[in-house]
Amino acid sequence: MHPATADESMVPSPRHGDGQGGDRPVTPGADVVAAADWGPLAGSRLGVMTNPTGILAGSLINIVDAMVTSGKVDVAAVFGPEHGFRGTAQAGYSEAGHTDERTGVKVYDAYGADPDRLQTMFAQAGIGTVVFDIQDVGARFYTYVWTMYAAMIAAVRSGLNFVVLDRPNPIGGAGRGPMIIDSFTSGVGMDKIVQAHGMTAGELARYFDGELMPAAAGDMLGDRLSVIKVKNWSPKMIFADTGLAWVPPSPNMPTPDTALLYPGTCLFEGTNLSEGRGTTRPFELIGAPYVDGRWAEWLNRREIEGVLFREAFFTPTFSKNADQICGGVQVHIPDPYAVDPILVATEMLVGLKALYAEFGWRSGDSYPGRGFDLLTGSARFREQLEAGAAAEEIVGAWQQELADFERRRRAYLLYSRH
């Protein structure tokens, strides 16, 4: 397959940096377009798929507000993802369709909408171009990229243009983790990518178009897909290097450190431990009423690169183990450039299995461990863990499929990995 074409007038060259920041400011795609007086988006009725992260870096103004105020483009509709356009909803929820009070623009609820439903919304709105501008966090189970995926299928079938206003991947450009297999696709993984894809939304859109759209949609967007690149960004950077304001992409993603750990520690959603929801440090605080100080001691003896574990006690106010005192750990990140979040979580899970007979899977799934399997993309990880495999064995099992993915994605990358 050939990668989807990006208009070179829209894609300034990235900085080939050392991962430590630089003198030239990192400029997201939205700001690139705004600096061009919105010209690349003029002449078409726009449907903007965004949320509170879709801001202009210089003013922190939401792009829909800025577009409407400018009068230079025709914003016909907004399509809100999980948590909603203005970000008022918790995990697993969205904002119902409504008219935005500030701009007067019709807002559609796109969360969980399949391509057929999105096609209907696009037709009702009378749009010619879908514009996607949402800060992703680089993990397969973060739902925004799957809303984009479904919207791309709908755009292919409807003959619409699709523009991604690109933003940095806050955890960098390395691919990590296992590939999903067909029988484990779901709303937290609809198609074939690895657990931490190491791509920006724009790169992922190109990958989706070239690798997945022919089967999923019957055709490609091709030259109807454009990516407006981030200026001066390198995949060697972490988010702190960008100088950009961190706007929480979702209520439980409060800091860039949360994002660094999330591709691994989100796996605890599938267990009987709290993943820190209902605390101020979700995905950093992990624990359960049965956990004691042995877990932190065990983990620190492992000398896992980039992280340290502090024994912690907390009481979640909602979600699993709500209103119960939980023992556990807080994951600290002394070296963010060295962190492999999926290895970190694997070591944590192996330690739990070795130390606590009470360790188990989330209740309420169709079979014990189903939720965990959907997050990892197959039953293999869970079965290895249950069989007592070491972390090295579990991680080693997916290295070939990861290498295959990284080879396939190469043609779609927009920012040098060298």
Language-model features, listed with the residues they occupy:
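Glycine-rich oxoanion-binding loops at beta->alpha junctions
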Residues: A91-I127, A139
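Glycine/threonine-rich flexible loop motifs
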Residues: D136-M148
